Amino acid sequence: MDIVLEICDYYLFDKVYADVFPKDGAVHEFLKPAIQSFSQIDFPSLPNLDSFDTNSTLISSNNFNISNVNPATIPSYLFSKIASYQDKSEIYGLAPKFFPATDFINTSFLARSNIFRETLSLFIITTIFGWLLYFIVAYLSYVFVFDKKIFNHPRYLKNQMSLEIKRATTAIPVMVLLTIPFFLLELNGYSFLYLDINECTGGYKAILWQIPKFILFTDCGIYFLHRWLHWPSVYKVLHKPHHKWIVCTPFASHAFHPVDGFFQSLPYHLYPLLFPLHKVLYLFLFTFVNFWTVMIHDGSYWSNDPVVNGTACHTVHHLYFNYNYGQFTTLWDRLGNSYRRPDDSLFVKDVKAEEEKKIWKEQTRKMEEIRGEVEGKVDDREYVEQ
């Protein structure tokens, strides 16, 4: 995110923060006592890990024995451990990397590297970008791809699209807020994100290899998180709002409970904390993920690929609840015995109206059986056909 944040700081935020939060301005004077009090807090020091005497302070290299623990040194040890993972050259805001310094770079008491400024900037940028990406991609899919015959499906809801949009637009800012800590870790050097492409970083071959690694890692993570979200106690609280949509439009793609959306995004944020990932590819993959999320909700069935977890597979998940939890592939569903092959009827084009009604009626019958098992007898949805 440092690339995006520096672009925004250079073209907009440096001046905005200088105007709204100037040094020695009213806000600064008001906050000075709190800032001074905060700066006087005696935080644990960050000792050099290489010189840390683990034998005499916290833990023996061979044993963990309570007699070896000195409680006073635990905070210092933990802080030093955390600090050892930090790449200080990647800390954002200490010096410009991609653009020259602006005239306003040092005129706000909230410097570029200030964690409160980073949090506010990230929230604004990511929320606006999330809304734009959601509306643009979902709208284009709705206009050019989405099969609007789905409006006649007996399990399409009253005012469904407006409900989907309302749910998504209110969820996105909360999902952003929940994921900001991961962006802050990246901005402060606690990730394996990098920019230079050379022999030391593996060159372009490494970048090409990162794409399938990212897909496979996140596909695995989302599968298990998604299955957990279908545990009855968790489903009722978090995941049921997304299953309100039995048949979907592209606008259902981000219509989650925000905590549900946060959990399903965790693998995307964990990957760069664990594995090397090029910064530009990182931005591309996050954009791709949003495209994919819209695509699997667009109701257009182009392929019945046995490997790719496409639109048809995800339609089966919304119709029949307990199948096809994967995001990109069918691998983990096959291994976890939760794969359900999409019905051939989904791929038949130019179906006559009467035949389509029979197909939908059979879908509804099967769906109601499983829905009753998952949610109970009471269905609080309001369908068009009621």
From Swiss-Prot:
E.C. code: 1.14.19.20
Membership in a protein family: Belongs to the sterol desaturase family.
Entry protein name: Delta(7)-sterol 5(6)-desaturase
Catalyzed reaction equations: a Delta(7)-sterol + 2 Fe(II)-[cytochrome b5] + O2 + 2 H(+) = a Delta(5),Delta(7)-sterol + 2 Fe(III)-[cytochrome b5] + 2 H2O
Gene field: ERG3
Domain Fatty acid hydroxylase span(s) in chain numbering: 214-337
Chief localisation class: endoplasmic reticulum
Function: The third module or late pathway involves the ergosterol synthesis itself through consecutive reactions that mainly occur in the endoplasmic reticulum (ER) membrane. Firstly, the squalene synthase ERG9 catalyzes the condensation of 2 farnesyl pyrophosphate moieties to form squalene, which is the precursor of all steroids.
Domain text: The histidine box domains may contain the active site and/or be involved in metal ion binding.
Topology in the lipid bilayer: Multi-pass membrane protein
Outcome when changing residue 97 to E: In strain: azole-resistant isolates
Top-rank EC class of the record's enzyme: oxidoreductase
Coiled coil residues, start to end: none
Pathway as given in its UniProt record: Steroid metabolism; ergosterol biosynthesis; ergosterol from zymosterol: step 3/5
Keyword Nuclease recorded: no
